[in-house]
Amino acid sequence: MEFKVLEETKTKLVFELLGETHTFCNLLKEEIRKVKGVEIVAYRIDHPLVGVPQFLVETKSIEPKKALQSALKSIKKNAEEFKKEAAKL
């Protein structure tokens, strides 16, 4: 996965996630949406076979990069909890 910032301001972040598909992008979008202060989060993939996911995050009371970091930490925590539970099977 490669992260490429296309546009960044105090309240807006546009970035690409090279090498990712809808699977991870939907998860990331939903986790960013849960972060307090996020106004808009969306992504698009222009072509289903060769397109690169492009995200838009707009915030009101938090820096967009901090919202992204918070969402990624949440995903990591949930994955670790799932791994522990799966090991019990």
Q: How should each PLM-predicted stretch be described?
A:
Residues 1-89:
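Protein-protein interaction/assembly regions in multi-subunit complexes
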